Amino acid sequence: MKKQVTFKPFRLSPVDHSLPKVYIFKSLYFRGVDDTGSLSRLQDGIDRLISCLPFLSGEVVPCADIPDKVGVLQVQMPCPSLQEIPMLLVKSYPNHTWPAASTSERWRNTALLDQSYRPLPDFIPPSKPRPVLRFQANFLADGLMLCMGYNHSVFDGTGAGNILEMLADCCRANPNSILALPTNGDIESELRGLLSSPGVAVANASQEAYAINCAHTEVEPEPSSAMLYCWPFLLSSEKIECLQEACNSLLPHIVRLYSGTQSSLINQDTNWPHILSSNDVLTALLAVSIEKAREATGALGHMSRSLAMAVNLRERLKPMPRHYLGNLVTTVWVSHHRPAVKDLETMVLPVPACNRHEIDRDDLLWITHVAFRIRLGLNAINEEHIRGLIHYLHSQDDWEQIGIHFTDPIFISSWRHLKVYELDFGPTIGHAEHFEMDVGTTDGVCVVMPANTRAVGKTKKAPWDIRIVLNPEVLQALIASAIFGWAMVKDAST
C-alpha cells in the first residue's frame, strides 16, 4: 500500500466561500481506448499528481478556530472513511457507448452523463465527509470516459481545467523524469492566504453593490425537471465574427449617445468601451435570442430583463497567476432590455452594417446595445473593484451566508479558453475526442464549452459549442428565431 502524502491544513479564501457548495463534473472521452495499458498509465498519472498536490486527496471541513467568524471552511487531511475511497474509481460498461453527435435520442445502450459515471454525488451535506476531488474511469464498448468530480468550494472551472492540464502532463511524462508543474500545495495554500490578507482586501465605496451581488441562496440537490431540457448548439465562428464586425461599426455611435446623455444607469467616470469582443457579442446574441423566444411563447412572466455573466478574475488581480487553482470568479450584471432611446435608430441608420440583409436592423441594434453594456460592466471590474469585493466577503461574520449571485433569468458562463482538446495524456490514451460537463437544470443557463481546435485544424476557428437550458417550447422558438438560426451551424444534437 502506498504511503499517503501529508499536507498542512489551509483555510479556503473568502472567494472560495462565495461559490455554491456543490460538486461539478467534467468528462473526457477517448475513443478506442481500453483498459490495456491505459488504466495503469492513468493510475500512475493520478498518483504523481497527488504527490505534487497532496491536498487534492483531502476533505473540506469547518474551521473552528477563527475568532468572530462562523461558517469558515478549510481543507485538511482526509478522515479514515475517505482514505478508503481511492482517488481513481474504475467501472466497466461493455454494453454502453458514447452518445453519437448525430443523434438527439439518448438510447439505453448509450453512456449518459448520469450518476453511475460519476465518482461523487452532486451534493454532499456538511454532516458527511466532503472530498476535494475524485476521478472515475468508465470503460465503454468504444472507449474510455474519464470523469473528474470536484468540490466547487475549492476550485472554479478554470482551476479545474488547470488540474486536467497537469494530469495530462503527469500521465504523459516518463516515470523516471523530473516533472515541473506550474503549482504545488504550498503555493496554493499561500495564494489562498494572500486573498485574505489586508494587502489584497481593501475597502472601497461600493459596499452596497457588493451586498446585492453577494446575496446568499441555499444549495440543495436539484430535483429532476421534466420541463427543462439542456440542448447543444453549434454557432458559426464566421457568423459571430461577422456580427462582431457589425456591432463594432455601431459602437462609436452608441458611446457618443450615452456619453452625451450620461444616463443615471452609467457612472460619471465610465471607462467607455473602444471595442466589443467576440464573447461580448456572442453573450448579447444569446441574451437577445432567449428573450425573444420567451417573449414569443409567453414565458417571460415577471422575469427581470437582466443577465449574469461569470468573470474570471485571474488576469485582473495582481499578483494572482493564471495557474491558480482556487475560486477567483465573480459575475457582471447586465440589463438586456430593448434599447429605449428613440434617437438611437436615427443616429445609426446611415451605418452600412445596419443594412446587411441577413441581419435584421432592430436585432442588430439590440445586440449591439447589450454587448455595449456587457463590455461596460467588464471594464468596471478592475483591480480596485476586485479588492473591494474581497474585503466585503472577508468582513462578513458568517461565511456560510455569503455567495455570488447566480440566479438571474439568464446566466452565461464560458469555458471556451480551456485547453481540454489540446491535452495529450500519452501513449495508450492520447487526446480527448469529446468533452462534456453537467450544466444543471436551471432555466436560462448557457454554458460555452471549450473550443475544439483539433477538429477544425490550425487555419480555422472552432465553432462556438454551447449548452442552453430552457423549457421545450422556448427551445423550439429559439431554434426558429431568425437571428439565432442565422448564426447556427446546426443543432448539435441532430
Curated annotation (Swiss-Prot):
One of its GO terms (molecular function) is acyltransferase activity, transferring groups other than amino-acyl groups. GO terms for biological process: alkaloid biosynthetic process; ergot alkaloid biosynthetic process; fumigaclavine C biosynthetic process; secondary metabolite biosynthetic process. Pathway: Alkaloid biosynthesis; ergot alkaloid biosynthesis. It is an enzyme of class 2 (transferase). One of its GO terms (cellular component) is cytoplasm. Keywords: Acyltransferase, Alkaloid metabolism, Transferase. Induction: The expression of the ergot alkaloid synthesis cluster which leads to the synthesis of fumigaclavines is positively regulated by the brlA and stuA transcription factors. Gene3D superfamilies: Chloramphenicol acetyltransferase-like domain (3.30.559.10). It catalyses: fumigaclavine B + acetyl-CoA = fumigaclavine A + CoA. InterPro entries: CAT-like_dom_sf, Sec_Metabolite_Acyltrans, Tri101-like_N. Transmembrane segments: none annotated. Ergot alkaloids are known for their toxic effects on humans who consume contaminated grains or livestock that graze on grasses harboring ergot alkaloid-producing fungi. Due to their strong affinity for monoamine neurotransmitter receptors they may also have clinical uses such as treatment of migraines, Parkinson's disease and cerebrovascular insufficiency. Pfam families: TRI-like_N. Its EC number is 2.3.1.205. Belongs to the fumigaclavine B O-acetyltransferase family. Fumigaclavine B O-acetyltransferase; part of the gene cluster that mediates the biosynthesis of fumiclavanine C, a fungal ergot alkaloid. DmaW catalyzes the first step of ergot alkaloid biosynthesis by condensing dimethylallyl diphosphate (DMAP) and tryptophan to form 4-dimethylallyl-L-tryptophan. The second step is catalyzed by the methyltransferase easF that methylates 4-dimethylallyl-L-tryptophan in the presence of S-adenosyl-L-methionine, resulting in the formation of 4-dimethylallyl-L-abrine. Monomer. This is Fumigaclavine B O-acetyltransferase easN.
